A protein has these predicted regions:
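Active-site-adjacent structural elements in enzyme catalytic cores
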Residues: 1-174
Length: 176
């Protein structure tokens, strides 16, 4: 696992995502494990690393509401406005899923958790990647989420393809 610093080598992390790799990076809440949500191979690898059931579903993060435009098409105008409205804190939304979200992301749910990230590293990853990425807590099932780079190493060692350096922040959850 190579360490990278934002934004100098961000393109290398994106190349890993495009090759169906798995990366670790800081988010608003804890360290995240991420991959391309359209790659079933990459998503299943994340789930294996975490020993997590596919039935639970995964969260997606994006750099802006535009990255979720196709998902928002079926929402009523008021719900769209609430989602698009600027918030002081990063907020996780549970949005009804549609055919743009693969079943390995939604699990046994008819909704998907999405967040517009404000974290500079996570936002940069989504911007350069050009679409949302998977963002699940960086921990094996039953262990507390990693809150430091050393904890990420302790949990996963060299099992990750890339490690993006940085610091974590905090977030909120709203159900629509």
């Amino acid at each position: 696992m190579k360490a990278i610093e934002y934004p100098k080598l961000l393109a290398s992390a994106i190349a890993v995502l495009k090759r169906q790799g798995v990366i670790s990076y800081p988010t608003e809440g804890v360290w995240g494990l991420g991959c391309d949500p359209m790659s079933e191979v990459a998503v299943r690898r994340v789930l294996r690393l975490k020993n997590r059931s596919i039935s639970k579903g995964l969260i997606l993060i994006g750099s802006s509401h535009q990255q979720f435009a196709r998902l928002l098409e079926d929402l009523d105008d008021q719900s769209k406005r609430r989602f698009i409205e600027k918030r002081s804190k990063p907020t996780t939304w549970l949005v009804p899923s549609n055919d743009t979200i693969p079943p390995w992301i939604t699990g046994n749910h008819d909704s998907v958790a999405v967040r517009i990230t404000k974290h500079p590293v996570a936002k940069g990853l989504c911007e350069v990647f050009g679409r949302p990425i998977v963002s699940t807590s960086c921990n094996p099932q039953g262990a507390p989420p990693a809150t430091s780079q050393s904890q990420v190493q302790e949990y996963f060692g060299d099992k990750l393809d890339y490690f993006v350096m940085g610091e974590v922040e905090r977030l909120s959850l709203i159900h629509i």
